Amino acid sequence: MRILALIPVFALAACETMMQPVSATGPAPGAGVTPAAAGTPAPTLNPNPPPPPPVAARTVDQFDTTSDADKAAALAVDDTAPVKDLGTTLATLGPPAEPGIWLKTPLVSALTMGVVSYKGKDAKMELRPSGGEAGSGSQISLAAMQTLGIPLTEIAEVSVSVE
């Protein structure tokens, strides 16, 4: 009978261990991970890249600093220019704080201009090397997703080519 009386005591003692903050039981989340330098722009081919979004940005419109003129220029794809097909990749939304119209992909090894196609719609954009293994997927910018009409939550299959 006395043993039954001790069961709640042991159960509550176990709860206390579970309620300790993470810093008391192990390293902080993300410890050992070096974040990218804040305010360091990604390499770009655009001589006049869009400005970074405001620090307090919370909405899609606040994060998307690419001008309507830049989006229209991206859609002006020359259908007569010869292209080299690089293949297809699955693309998800990349860091929304990185402005511009770009695709980070393992299909290229150097920064270059290319054409990305999604459901019959083409857009010129920067192809940035992701450093990933072939088949590892790609990240696409917020502005590029909006330009191509890709829903922001979609894992989109896109075709990639270079001129």
Predicted region positions:
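Long, compositionally biased stretches
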Residues: 16-133, 151-163
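Sec-dependent signal peptide recognition
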Residues: 1-8
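Short, solvent-exposed secondary-structure boundary/capping segments
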Residues: 134-142
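C-terminal motif of bacterial Sec signal peptides marking the signal peptidase cleavage site
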Residues: 11-14
